[in-house]
Amino acid sequence: MKIAQINTVCGNGSVGRITVDIYHALKKSGHDGKIYYGRRTAPDSVTTEKIGSNLDMGIHVLSTFFTGTHGFNSHAQTKQLIESLKAYDPDLIHMHNIHGFYLDVEELFAYLKTCGKPVVWTLHDCWSFTGHCAYFDYVACDKWKTGCEKCPQFRNSYPYALFKDGSKVNYARKKAAFQGVKGLTIVTPSKWLGDLVKESYLQEYPVKVIPNGIDLDKFVPQKTKKRDKHLILGVANVWDRRKGLEYFKELHGMLDPEKYEIAVVGVNKKQIKELPQGMIGIEHTQNVEELMELYSQASVFANPTLEDNFPTTNLEALACGTPVVTFATGGSVESIDETCGRIVPQKDVKALYKAVTELCENVEQMRGACRERALLYNKYNRFGEYLDLYEESIHHYNNL
């Protein structure tokens, strides 16, 4: 098989790493692959092609910022991608994030409707079926089910627009572009997101759930020095409003400082200065060993997220033997059961406090069950599911 993958980035961030991992799984199984990406740099070990330049991306950002439209610029860059796809001639095209200021989605989908190739599209958020937002739980909006307009967060949620709410036009254009692709299969990492797709204008397509996985040879329980206090850990790539940093601050004020301490990883310098006294802030780290040590030292991993698909941080904590407590948000609940964590109502800090303190008292009895739960999410099994899906899709398409 020859598989072309398309994503905003390659080797960076969770989705960028997934594309690279799938590429290596293909090569290991004797297949061929190529990754097309729009931003940053890519690992030397991967066959790639960058679409456009930083200047092109900047123009797209400004267009979104001033006109409220997103995904309808970058015409020349999209033509470059299409010509390269024609030359590479893959057996299947696998798209991940097609937002991110690097593609004209109308032009890309016009090609997909005529190229004679099966398509797999993995959705990592909700952008594909809304007029603006990547997530809408925070504002409890369901306009995407019938038609977006008067977006309540076009100014303060990605992709940011300053002057104009383009959600009504964006919704109509995306709906027209994304419907009617022969042989397209949608993949979601969570059942939660898959169920949303079935309520959206993408409901014509089959949906397969393939959860994110992690490297269980890398994330393993570590022997660490016993701490004087129970450590409650939080980890995020970016601590924006939906990740729940404010709830950690509230929780900190409720916990006995003689028995508990909180550490949050991924905060910036400004956020560190704003943390309450005694709360530990650690800047973003890509060091797996450092993360493993923190996960293993923690008595509880807390994830008070307000919008999420299927966070791999939950899996990383479980793999290191640490129970997880999460708000009942999106797909964050799907990796947790009573043997390895707790699920509490959104924004309920009293329930969060109760769950955290209860788990701290029972953590040593739960560590084995946490690791067992993580074994369900071995990333190599997940990539095997993708390779099986590729073969099924190609076979099915050739027999349509």
Feature roles, as predicted:
Residues 293-298, 386:
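Short alpha-helical donor nucleotide-sugar binding micro-motif in glycosyltransferases
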Residues 187, 225-243, 249-252:
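Conserved donor-binding/catalytic core segment of Leloir-type glycosyltransferases
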Residues 192, 213:
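Carbohydrate-associated surface elements
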Residues 338, 342-349, 357-363:
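Conserved acidic donor-binding segment of nucleotide-sugar-dependent glycosyltransferases
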Residues 364-399:
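A charged, aromatic-enriched C-terminal amphipathic alpha-helix characteristic of glycosyltransferases
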Residues 323-326:
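Short hydrophobic beta-strand element within catalytic cores of glycosyltransferases
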Residues 266-289:
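Nucleotide-activated donor-binding/catalytic signature segment of Leloir-type glycosyltransferases, i.e.
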Residues 306:
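Aromatic "clamp/platform" in nucleotide-sugar-dependent glycosyltransferases that forms part
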